[in-house]
Amino acid sequence: MYNRIISYLEKFSIPHNHQFGFRSKHSTTHALLLLTDKIQRSVDNGTYSCGIFLDLCKAFDTVDHKILLAKLEYYGIRGVVHDWFASYFSNRRQFVSLFGTNNYSDYQIVTCGVPQGSVLGPLLFLLYINDMPKCSNTLEFHLFPDDTNLFFNNPNILNLETILNVELEKVTQWLFANKLSLNIEKTSFVVFHSPQRWIAHKLNLSSSSMSVKSVNQVKYWGLIFHSNLN
């Protein structure tokens, strides 16, 4: 089933172009090179750029089955295959066992989430967040399971802040509509700029439901990005 679905998705170019997780010819290396190039170009042009690094809280476990099935249908996965996925999600059960004992909890019906460790789980999650970039025509999105980057640049630091706060609210509303939440402690932003260009204004980024912390550097996909890109 995985091969059939991935072949169909790639044939009709359904995955977002900056969707880098679990796709052929779209590795994290490509994502890192793309982001680094964007930042470097911004610094060379004398503009300010901001990377907002989102960390989704229990991303795979909170996927809403009804929303996911609706998205599968939207992407053209219908008929027998759609029914197969509906059956795949129905009546899934889980229980908790105490290690080293024969004590087990009662079975509970699983109403959300995609199976972690499965072949289909990551692919289904990528389809679940595939339409996130549609919530903003201003931001550039780099998508990866539970680790998404938003990028924007502007020559004026005050305009950068104003626009980002407006767009961040759109992202927050998308997350709410799709029943996903951010790990606030691990979500942060970095303002990238030339070492010779001092920032007189400290950015404050927030939405109606959260405030994003500012940091001088962030570790993203194993690479540390510093505000001066040094």
Where are each of the predicted segments found?
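Active-site palm subdomain of RNA-directed nucleic acid polymerases
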Residues: 4-17, 122-152
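Catalytic palm active-site di-aspartate
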Residues: 19, 49-59, 85, 113-121, ...
